[in-house]
């Protein structure tokens, strides 16, 4: 990624919370996993920054969704049931984020958001962790929409999502995964028109075919992503 020209790289910590790691019986290693992941990314980012000091590279701590949500029931016969509480989730996120901050991340990226309540738990945990560690870094959010109507899996529109998180000190809001780059454009336009933050995007390479592979070529995706820049759909919101 850095050789290709990236300014920001993510840590390899997408599912590195005790909630998600419990499925693999390694939840006791969450702190160690996050510390190691940040240090690895930090080392290589600093290496590239040293080569070109006028182009600093940054490390964003990847905070992904968990395998349990606060808004949806895993039991179709009991829609009121929740697999965990907000406080339990916030505590798990805080454990992850404190390790990231101690290891030296430049930003926190709460990504692939499909449940706004989960995201709010992560935002709360981030604020608590930054206060405890005594370090403040930019807070980045990235949502994934699950249908062509632009709603998240938990049913919120992008406008409703923005309203739900407007209390937070946010650096950027964006979209990731979801559909291909071209299909994501109208939703980026919605964000840019409403959000008083920087806008980001990193879509999938289209949707997989029946064999589970992707037909879109790197060159095709690059052309579509280039349109985001030329048409002002990423960067500072309008």
Task: Label each region the model flagged.
Residues 2-236:
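Domain-level signal for soluble alpha/beta catalytic cores
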